[in-house]
Amino acid sequence: MAKKVLIVEDDKFLRELISQKLLKEGYDIAETVDGEKGLETVKKEKPDLVLLDLILPGINGFDVLTKIKEDPSLAQIPVIILSNLGQKDDIERGLKLGAVDYLIKAHFTPGEIIAKVKSVIG
């Protein structure tokens, strides 16, 4: 059975680009464009991994991550943050809240993002 990745990203171009690459690699994909829908989808679909933007409409990615990690039925789901926020404080906060990795969008190609996903969930 294919592993499912949830992409929570409001940038349509980036979301679709990553989705297409993950689909080509054999992953199932779910997509949402805001924090609330992202959290609902995590609860409903229990994906194998979440790619999470931080600056989102509605509740931000830090809050989504906190809620995922506080819920015992979701806490084991790995979350990779994918954000333009590159300040040391933001990175440390994301990792401290439980993200398995923090990728700054400008520093990673879509191919490298897919490689990170593979390294976490195979």
Residue map of PLM features:
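The feature encodes the CheY-like receiver
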Residues: R15, P57, T66, A75, ...
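Charged docking surfaces used in two-component/phosphorelay signaling
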Residues: E16-K24
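Conserved acidic carboxylate
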Residues: E9
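Acidic catalytic/metal-coordinating carboxylates
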Residues: D34-K37, N60-T66
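Active-site residues of response regulator receiver
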Residues: D53, S83
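Short hydrophobic/Thr-rich beta-strand motif most characteristic of the beta2 strand and flanking loop
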Residues: G26-V33, T41
